């Protein structure tokens, strides 16, 4: 972006200066539409989400058969919702300010199969593609027991096809594991941020890992180009895929069921706040869409991004979406939160969700390290740095009077609030890597 254009943009959008200075900030969205109007602009419906849920149910017998870790939930890929009262108390002490309401952790960090939120969207899109191919070939019917897919004849059939994806790590891991299990040939195009252990894991499964010295955007673009050369190759597009988005959206309906089981009330007097780490936007965008369908006006969805990679905040705040990257304003897009190291947000998610997401904030890497150490110490839960990004959200909410006034959130309502921090990854991190994460804050 030319200097002149940037200067003009900064006059119009003064918060850009704060982002350029790598300062932590919170921006609540003044462009929220009434719920039904905003949902209509997404271009997808509750019926689409229910169909995605039904497809996952069809695959459950197969998943339970080939992934023993899913058997306890009968092939359902779902995570626990746990109250983290000790963490809440520790945060209150650390911040010298009581965190009001009840704090919960959604442990997508420990989802079966691939140990991250990407086990939702990534695995779902691979399954949807496999189902389509098998049905078109006359090998599968919707009413079949899908455990039949665990046969050499199906693996041989799928081996004619290739699946490709560009990733900073976790999406590649989810898609690689699932595709390889079904028998597909797989290529994962990985950015410079991707952790070595993730590449090693994929290669051990026979996945073709293509490495780039550049960031996420380049890995996706190169992956897309390579896939175009092969008519038997299906490219999973993290930036634009509605199928991925729907795989994530199922989480909203599932969380509502968990709330009912735990008798957690959500209504006008008992607001729900959900804090989601955001990279390119597909995961948090899809989950938020599902949450808005499930809980309506009473759920507030807030995205958290690293100070070095606030691509969604920048895109939505300026209205430029994928037409602007963090590099355009001079940021380096280098962060310890490798899953969030994205310079340019998804235009599809930004535009679809801009009237639904309630707020966006940024967080320093050092704060992420402190938070994962504190979570480990207080709750004995281990997550990777990016997964802790949502943990500061409740403070931004309760200390921003304009936000509270806009949503008519009284002190009494906040007392009855439920805060859910969506932990997005870390379940598969090798113990020695996790130890490095946990000791980082002590050594600095």
UniProtKB/Swiss-Prot annotation:
Cofactor(s) essential for the protein = pyridoxal 5'-phosphate
What are the record keywords, sorted? Answer: Lyase, Pyridoxal phosphate
Signal peptide positions (record): none
Task: Note the InterPro entries from the entry.
Answer: D_Ser_am_lyase, Ser/Thr_Dehydratase, Ser/Thr_deHydtase_PyrdxlP-BS, TrpB-like_PALP, TrpB-like_PALP_sf
**GO molecular function annotations of the record:** D-serine ammonia-lyase activity; hydro-lyase activity; pyridoxal phosphate binding
User: For this protein, what reaction is catalysed?
Assistant: D-serine = pyruvate + NH4(+)
Q: Known EC number(s)?
A: 4.3.1.18
Listed GO biological process terms: D-serine catabolic process; isoleucine biosynthetic process
* Residues recorded with modification N6-(pyridoxal phosphate)lysine: 118
Q: Which domain of life is it from?
A: Bacteria
Q: Does the keyword Zinc apply?
A: no
Q: Which Pfam families match?
A: PALP (PF00291)
The entry assigns this protein to a family as follows: Belongs to the serine/threonine dehydratase family. DsdA subfamily.
Q: What is the protein named? A: Probable D-serine dehydratase
Task: Name its species.
Answer: Acinetobacter baumannii (strain ATCC 17978 / DSM 105126 / CIP 53.77 / LMG 1025 / NCDC KC755 / 5377)
User: What gene is this protein a product of?
Assistant: dsdA
């Amino acid at each position: 972006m030319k200097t002149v254009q940037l200067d003009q943009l900064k006059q119009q959008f003064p918060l850009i200066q704060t982002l350029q200075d790598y300062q932590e900030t919170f921006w609540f969205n003044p462009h929220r539409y009434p719920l039904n109007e905003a949902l209509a602009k997404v271009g997808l419906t509750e019926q689409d989400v229910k169909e995605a849920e039904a497809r996952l149910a069809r695959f459950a017998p197969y998943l339970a058969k080939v992934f023993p870790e899913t058997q306890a939930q009968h092939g359902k890929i779902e995570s626990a919702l746990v109250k983290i009262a000790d963490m809440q108390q520790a945060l209150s002490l650390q911040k010298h300010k009581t965190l009001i309401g009840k704090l919960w952790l959604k442990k997508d960090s420990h989802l079966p199969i691939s140990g991250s939120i990407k086990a939702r969207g990534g695995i779902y899109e691979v399954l949807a593609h496999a189902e389509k191919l098998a049905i078109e070939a006359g090998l599968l019917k919707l009413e079949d027991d899908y455990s039949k897919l665990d046969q050499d004849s199906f693996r041989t059939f799928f081996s004619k096809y290739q699946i490709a994806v560009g990733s900073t790590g976790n999406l590649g891991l989810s898609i690689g594991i699932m595709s390889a299990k079904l028998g597909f040939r797989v290529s994962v195009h990985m950015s410079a941020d991707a952790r070595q252990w993730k590449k090693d894991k994929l290669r051990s499964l026979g996945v073709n890992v293509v490495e780039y010295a550049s960031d996420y955007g380049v890995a996706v673009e190169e992956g897309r180009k390579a896939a175009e050369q092969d008519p038997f190759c299906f490219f999973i597009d993290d930036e634009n895929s509605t199928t991925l988005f729907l795989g994530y959206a199922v989480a909203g309906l599932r969380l509502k069921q968990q709330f009912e089981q735990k008798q957690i009330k959500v209504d006008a007097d008992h607001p729900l706040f959900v804090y989601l780490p955001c990279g390119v936007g597909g995961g948090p965008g899809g989950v938020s869409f599902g949450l808005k369908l499930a809980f309506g006006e009473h759920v507030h969805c807030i995205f958290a991004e690293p100070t070095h990679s606030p691509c969604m905040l920048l895109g939505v705040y300026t209205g430029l979406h994928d037409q602007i990257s963090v590099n355009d304003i001079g940021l380096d897009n280098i962060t310890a939160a490798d899953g969030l190291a994205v310079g340019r947000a998804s235009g599809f998610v930004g535009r679809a969700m801009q009237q639904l997401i309630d707020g966006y904030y940024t967080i320093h890497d050092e704060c992420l390290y402190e938070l994962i150490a504190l979570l480990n110490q207080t709750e004995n839960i281990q997550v990777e740095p990016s997964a802790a990004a949502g943990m500061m959200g409740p403070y931004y909410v309760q200390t921003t009077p304009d936000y509270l006034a806009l949503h008519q959130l009284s002190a009494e309502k906040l007392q009855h609030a439920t805060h859910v921090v969506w932990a997005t990854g870390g379940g598969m991190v090798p113990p020695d890597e996790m130890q490095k994460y946990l000791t980082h804050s002590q050594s600095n």
